[in-house]
Amino acid sequence: MILGPSGAGKTTLGRRTAQRLGLAFLDIDEFIWRKDTPKPFTAMFSREERIARLQQAVSQAGRFVMAGSMDSIHQHFDPYFRLAVYLTAPAALRVERVHRRELEAFGPRVLPGGDMEEDHRLYLEDVAGYELGTGSTTQQRHQAWIDSLSCKVIYLDGAAPIESNAEAICQAWWKVMGLVKETGK
C-alpha cells in the first residue's frame, strides 16, 4: 500500500513497483470515483460500493501493489497489507505536479474560463493544505492510519527518483516476504 498526499507520486511509483515485482496494480481512484459525471473526480461511489468494488479487485488480484488515499474505508483492507509506504513530497512540488497532470488530462477546461477552473483552483488549494491540516486529506489523518497498521511501514521522498524509490520498496517487500536475509546482524 502506497499512501500519501496528492501529487507525491503514488500512482507513478505504484505502477513501476508493481511492474518490477510482477504484481497487479490497483489505483484506488479507479474504484472510488464515478466516471459517469460531466466533471471528473466530483462524485464518488457510495461507501458500500467503494468497499465492494475494491474488495472484488483485491480478491481477483491476490498479491498486489495498491496506491492512493482510502481514508474512510482503509479499515476493511488493512489486514491485506504486508508493507505500507508513506510517500511524501514538498507542497510546492505536489501542487506543480497536480496542476500539470490536470492540465494534461483536461486541457483548457482547468484554465481561466474553463468549466473546471474553479474545481481545479480549489483542488490545488486542497493539495497545498495537506500538512496544514486544511485539506480534505491531511498528514495527521495519514499518520494516524500508519500508526494503526500492523505491517511494516517505510517512509520515502516522492521528490527522489522513481527508480530508487521502487528499488527501496522492492527490497522492503522481499524482506517482508522472507526472500532476502538481512545482513550485518
Where are the model-predicted features located?
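The conserved Walker
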Residues: 6
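Conserved substrate/cofactor phosphate-moiety recognition/catalytic segment
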Residues: 15, 19-59
